[in-house]
Amino acid sequence: IDINLDVEKKSNSKDELTGFDVSMDSFAKAVSEIGRNCKEEVLIIVETTVPPGTCKKLVKPIIEEELARRGLQNNKYKLGHSYERVMPGPNYINSIREYPRVYSGIDSQSADATEAFLKTIINTSICNLTRLNNTNETEIAKVLENSYRAMNISFIVEWSRFAEEADANLYSIVNAIRERETHSNLMYPGIGVGGYCLTKDPLLASWSQKAHFDSKNDLNMSTKSVSINDQMPKFAYRRMIEVFGNFEDKNILFLGISYRGDVGDTRFTPVSSLYDYVKAVTKKISLHDPYINYWEEQDIKVEQDIETVLSRSQDIIIISTGHSFYKKDETINKLMKIQSTNIYDTIGLFNNDQIAKLSQKHNLSVLGRGDI
């Protein structure tokens, strides 16, 4: 069952996070529905990313209440938690079957049953199943795992600005640092965070700390990372103005609207914020994405034919999603055939050879590269 878990964020005019709230209503309703229809000895495994404490403080009491209401024993069911680590894109199935899993249960019997089930779908010959002591631990593990990545991304934002001010190539700098094993996952610059995980998961932990555990402490750094990441599109927009000047009433082309490369998914894509900023100064905007023909959140058509959008006179072409299609030789050659224009690579998609080639004809800028 796929269940929505909503986080409502509130921001000021600077896109700084000012507050948030987590609604568990739809999740609780779905759990109640399960309890009204499941067997007495059911195994329930929660894979959804949930606020720590959810299995014990929400799922468990609801299931037991519904079973008792039906006149069934409420001590025979089993409840486990094993969060998914799916990676959208061409390797989606492999990211489920051939990736390590963490799991737990509300008791040892539930944990054993969860392990037995996971062994039927996970290739344990190459992937470890790591058992934690209880569901609080696995729930924390998931939001900590994603908060770490969100913070890593937000960390690089201010260094992108510094690199541009210092006429430095942050990509080369990061590559050099990555040679050190302890720093091998340092992130590259980019337009921002999108999708249905990193945009909210740190907030689930912050909410849970108060709502489920009555804590007086705060996860300030994790919450701050969400606020910083939400502001990344504005930074990219301001940099575009610095480099290319005022583009009021200019023709702008976005290449890519998905939140992730080689995926047709626009949920919480950072491109949406950048699009809104650009739309405020010009209505002459074209959109292209090889995986999407309609942008639901913006209620607008998206072109899938690259030649159609390139045939129009474009004042600025924004590389906004890391689709491999855009760095193919065929696409580069098409870009070389159009009239001289401005190209803004917000994600560091092009390699040095491609940058050199495109720069022979176009005015090219790359986010995080002050050397060009």
Cite the ranges covered by each PLM segment.
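Structural/interface elements that position substrates and couple domains in central-metabolism enzymes
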Residues: 1-372
